[in-house]
Amino acid sequence: MTDAELARAVADEAGVLLLAIRADGGETGKALGARGDAEANQLIIDRLRAARPADFILSEESVDDRARCAARRVWIVDPLDGTREYAEGLDDWAVHVGLAIDGRPHTAAVALPALAQVYATDDGPRFHPVLHPPRMVVSRTRAPDIARRVGEALGATLIPMGSAGAKAMAVVDGRADIYLHDGGQYEWDNCAPAAVALAAGLHASRIDGSPLIYNCEDPLLPDLLICRQELADTVLKAIADAR
């Protein structure tokens, strides 16, 4: 099984588990989110350790083993991206299973279980025409000011949406053209989405245009831009002007 096949299978299985937990009805609200996080995390860790015992794992829901910093291959996972959306019965939450090699986003899968979708790096490039005005996905609950300013400068239509994975995949599958975040994220929030976006032929970088670097000692990675390649220069200039 290739790394991409493994990422896809694990993300899909974790998504099936999360749907079953939510359908069970035993918990609601924060308790539901906590149970989903914990059980999906354990499943992902168990599957990755069984299939790739020499690799390290960085997960939002597990104790960080800093020995990973010296490793070439590190799986970076978020078992439930969008806990609020999951607990509220919405569909814009995700499972992230990403592999960074030498600090770069390499292989990944992002599952949107409530939509029965799994996106992976072995899907290959996707090409969608940019609509005018361009469409920008922003946080439903806490859209950063810079995203609003950039959206205004570009004349973009803003589309509120939940989790980071859901927003990134909206760009991957052509439902949006730009995803800009500057409100604080960690490596597990965007490693898998960035890898899938890059494999799909999109632009993915920090908001200053610099590369996304993973497996750092401090996993804080506070900003992200995913957009159509043909929009990248325009969006980066609008970001610089808005800061």
Identify the meaning behind each predicted range.
Residues S59-E61, D122, G162, D208:
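Short loop/edge segments at beta-strand edges and connector loops
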Residues M1-A9, D123, P129-L131, K237-R243:
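Short, low-complexity, intrinsically disordered N-terminal peptides in bacterial proteins
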Residues A67-C69, E88, H128-L131, N215-P219:
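Solvent-exposed alpha-helices and their adjacent loops that cap or buttress functional pockets
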Residues R68-D123:
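DPxDG-like acidic metal-binding loop motif
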